Swiss-Prot record:
Family membership: Belongs to the Rap family.
EC number(s) reported in the record: 3.1.3.-
GO function terms (MF aspect): phosphoprotein phosphatase activity
Functional note: Activates ICEBs1 gene expression, excision and transfer by inactivating the ICEBs1 repressor protein ImmR. RapI-mediated induction likely results from an increase in the specific activity of the protease ImmA, which mediates proteolysis of ImmR. In addition, is involved in regulation of sporulation. Acts as a phosphatase that specifically dephosphorylates the sporulation initiation phosphotransferase Spo0F and inhibits its activity.
Main enzyme class: hydrolase
Residue spans of the TPR repeats: 62-95, 150-183, 184-217, 224-257, 275-311, 338-371
Subcellular location: Cytoplasm
Alphabetical list of InterPro entries matching this protein: TPR-like_helical_dom_sf, TPR_rpt
Gene Ontology CC: cytoplasm
Protein name per Swiss-Prot or TrEMBL: Response regulator aspartate phosphatase I
Regulation: Inhibited by PhrI.
The keyword RNA-binding belongs to this UniProt entry's keyword annotation: no
Amino acid sequence: MRGVFLDKDKIPYDLVTKKLNEWYTSIKNDQVEQAEIIKTEVEKELLNMEENQDALLYYQLLEFRHEIMLSYMKSKEIEDLNNAYETIKEIEKQGQLTGMLEYYFYFFKGMYEFRRKELISAISAYRIAESKLSEVEDEIEKAEFFFKVSYVYYYMKQTYFSMNYANRALKIFREYEEYAVQTVRCQFIVAGNLIDSLEYERALEQFLKSLEISKESNIEHLIAMSHMNIGICYDELKEYKKASQHLILALEIFEKSKHSFLTKTLFTLTYVEAKQQNYNVALIYFRKGRFIADKSDDKEYSAKFKILEGLFFSDGETQLIKNAFSYLASRKMFADVENFSIEVADYFHEQGNLMLSNEYYRMSIEARRKIKKGEIIDENQPDSIGSSDFK
């Protein structure tokens, strides 16, 4: 006898599956280095694993999920993500995915579509994944799903749905001390929704708590995200100096890791400095942020930087602003349209340009109407992701 190795020393697939689960845990915790190490170990074991189709399919799905993680944590090219998606899409078309594997496909597809800012496609994929949650026994996996859905709804400014899913995730994560990281991420969503509800002081309190937990956990990207969110909150409170201080702290960390939130931080910092009329400083951040957005083919932030260019760094080229809003609207990013159109309207009002000011105020009202219409549509669809009972 030679222990557990059977079939001419082939590695039992259940041992490889255990290693795959460890890999997935590292991915969910955004532990890039650990995930890379385990991925390499898994790939070596697969070469000598006893035949098992489900284990191979699970590997391919996790490889896709791994690429999604890298696209956030290391600003990896979206093209790499597209290639990984095409591979698993072909597998799904062949009808090889059932049970948990099918759940993972739609769950990861939702993340992929959200990364591409295909918001409706993301919600559609999550809706199918939710219909298969009965296949999921692990409470932590359910909480992870609730968190991801809450993030999309937060992005779409669907506050009711976002808060409900975030709270469902929090209820589970708080029961496990080892999931402090996930708890912090959920708190980000709750606090972001408080900002959307104009409850800035409560949001700031949440973000400051998140910063404290992130520092205790010594997780740099969460520390940076906390500083970024605190900066955004101070921006809303019109405490621009404090906003700049926290955004700069976030920037220092994101620049080292090349995190995907680097562009967002540079954009916000540009805007905050411009609001303080520190145009020379703002221009430095603007050039850096626009360069990164263009280089990484980040169409969302390329458009947003055009808004700032039209307002502060051009000779009154208002067409830049119109083009940017056209792009955001075409992607159904109505929350961004509403927020920025109000800011632009206020700017033109201060400049005495009442015609443009009124145009953008009207745009904000129309965007708000579309956001509200989206909530009504979801509530009336029985198979909607937002129509389940919240407890």
